[in-house]
Amino acid sequence: MDYKSAGVDVEAGRAFVQRIKASVEATHRPEVVGGLGGFGGLMRLPTGLRKPLLVSGTDGVGTKLELAQNHHCHHGVGIDLVAMCVNDVITSGAAPLFFLDYMATGALSPAAMAEVVEGIADGCRQSGCALLGGETAEMPGFYPQGRYDLAGFCVAVVEEDDLIDGRSISPGDQIIGIASSGVHSNGFSLVRKVLEKAGINENSQYGPDNRRLLNDLLAPTTLYASLVQELLSNAIKIHGMAHITGGGLPENLPRCLPEGMTAKIEAEAWPRSPLFQWLQSAGAIPERDLWHTFNMGIGFCLVVPKEAEQTALDVCHLNNHQAWVIGEVLKTPPGEHSALQGLPS
């Protein structure tokens, strides 16, 4: 008996590393020291920083992986993994530095795993961060053969004096919602139940334009890092930012608001996607659950002073991101719960 007969193919693992090497190294920034294969990734801090703060984040892709693996769509979930981490850390105004990934699988499929890593590398390039390293664990008997799970880890940097933490938010500030590409990477346990109930197959279509349902459900999560850096480089004063993930607007936007503040959201300020309309209809999902599960077409929010509203919108549109003013910051009445106004409670 040997390791391979026990389910772990070391030679396939080595071949996999060689296969992904070019994709990984294509993400490297000038600050990266050394190459792939060391025990730890090395990277210098960018020059010119006076009081740098490191910002870290970690996340996964959730049960979207089940749907993606069932339909052999591996590249997109690599982008999802980067987006779920990067979109969190940039809410502080930080610029992504590097990314690490962890993949666990029942049996290494070099082709599928390479697609995932190429997606991760794609997401890193879009975000300006280096894919500094990773781990692929082959775990036969723990994961079913052909199945894998993903985790990502991102580190970003921001000048301490430029940190965006919501403390400068005040009543009258405007909330700009930036479009999502669809469901992103949250709510897929519910999505999968809806698909099961509706008897969907890989060719099923929906909506007035007869779009392919699975294509839209598996669309990669939008990356907002380059847009945020563009907004900041245009000296737009951003008071707060929120990544709209699990829990939707009602649970994520308040995370960037200081105590004593809430927001009134105008739910008609942006068009409701036919994808969410289909999910609600096919799954008989109550309106409140819809808003508390999905992003409802808004993947990221900016909180800006009134005078910065139009400039911020212009920068979003110039960078090919749809965006709308979707609400306003209000002072919370004494003794009143700070839940968002204007959305199903």
UniProtKB/Swiss-Prot annotation:
* Keyword Membrane tagged: no
Q: In which pathway does it act?
A: Purine metabolism; IMP biosynthesis via de novo pathway; 5-amino-1-(5-phospho-D-ribosyl)imidazole from N(2)-formyl-N(1)-(5-phospho-D-ribosyl)glycinamide: step 2/2
Any one cellular component term from GO for this entry? cytosol
A Pfam family found in this protein is AIRS_C
- The EC number(s) attached to this protein equal 6.3.3.1
Q: Please name the InterPro entries in this protein's record.
A: PurM-like_C_dom, PurM-like_C_sf, PurM-like_N, PurM-like_N_sf, PurM_cligase
Q: Which HAMAP family would you find in this protein's record? A: AIRS (MF_00741)
Query: Per its record, how is this protein called by name?
Result: Phosphoribosylformylglycinamidine cyclo-ligase
Give the originating organism.
Answer: Synechococcus sp. (strain CC9902)
